Amino acid sequence: GFTWDVFNDKTLKVRGGSGFFTGRIPLVFFTNMPTNSGMIQNLVSITTRYKDGKVINRDPRLELLKGNMIIDVNQMISTLGLPTTITPEEGVLPSGIVGIDPDFKMPQVWKTSLALDYQIPASFPLTVTLEGMFSKDINAVRQFNYNIKSPEDTWQRFNGPDERYIYPENYLEHTNINSANVLTNTSKGWGWTGNITVFAEPAKNVNIMAAYTHTESKEISGMPGSDANSAWTNMPSINGPNNSGLMRSRYVTPNRVIASINWRVHVNKRSTSNFSLFYSGYSSGSYSFMYSNDMNGDGVTNDLIYIPKTKDEIKFTSAEDADAFWKFVNQDPYLKKHKGEYAEAYSASAPWIHRFDFRWSRDFFVKIGKTKNTLQLSLDILNIGNLLNSKWGVTKNMSG
């Protein structure tokens, strides 16, 4: 990174940096593999039962485990006399198999930022900051189901403007299991953030801050699940989760405005009070328009809709249904703007939420010996606007 004081007087600074950042994923996606590997698994419970402090039942196999802890799997199998083979009749085939790409890497992203701080000539301190950051996925994470056949040109498609593939009845590579999900990497994701922030002190002991941030982020998968299978089946798509392509990140907040004002009052030499009001405005979430059934026959019900462009592109059983549908489309900003297109995942935004928080604090200065100490008493009222109107500061999300 770097910081450049352009005029050597701190009125204009340019700063930036670039680097690679590595994180991790929830460990449940690693534990999915040994528990869903399709290999022989044997659960052994060896216990000793006590009653009134006396042993009433002791598993004789405990004697076999005396000494150093056994950490070799084969030695453990041999010591306990566990089976090393199993017949098809004795085994239970899992409905799905989970694996991890042997070349899998932890999530890694390349981030580059550039910012400008400018002190505007004014009768009071006034600073404007412009910031931009671009990120590129080096090793993003996704699930890929290798038991699903890839679409081919010989497959049938929908007739009309919606030309998505129709999966055949034999779309599974192996019919004796439903899925073979593999945790793997992709490098196709990217994102950028732009921010403008204004700091001002228009009067003594009065500080004002206001900022606006816009964010765009595209990804292959946000891993929307608690295990390998749900992280794959919950991905919105047109031609199946394996062929989802880049989509807007489900975790991004496209637009956000924040502001604060703080007034510091000197009560006396031993005490000051602070009054602060904080504002935050943003869309409370994003959602996708999807069919409620499995439109393309891939066994997943998260199919993104096609938004008809004209009335002749879609048929209804009654005129009332048609009127209700087009009334809904034309009142929704996203659907109205994207007629004739497939709906993009997580691109429709929930209503904005405007929230105010209030904070009052009182600082008491106490000198003990030669040391000056501060004792603070504070009161926080979160979402204070909701106390005035029950509809203010309320988050609205999709229920299904």
For each feature predicted by the language model, list its residue ranges.
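Residues that define the transmembrane beta-barrel architecture of outer-membrane proteins
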Residues: 108-110, 190-192, 253-257, 352-356, ...
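C-terminal beta-signal and terminal closure region of outer-membrane beta-barrel proteins
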Residues: 348-349, 389-400
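Extracytoplasmic gating/loop element in the C-terminal half of outer-membrane beta-barrel translocons
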Residues: 82-86, 272-369, 376
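Residues on the lipid-exposed face of transmembrane beta-strands in outer-membrane beta-barrel proteins
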Residues: 2-4, 114-118, 196-200, 210, ...
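Solvent-exposed loop/turn elements at secondary-structure boundaries
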Residues: 3-182, 351
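Short loop/turn motifs that connect adjacent beta-strands in outer-membrane beta-barrel proteins
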Residues: 6-12, 121-125, 202-205, 266-275, ...
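Extracytoplasmic loops and strand-loop junctions of Gram-negative outer membrane beta-barrel proteins
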Residues: 43, 94-100, 174-183, 238-245, ...
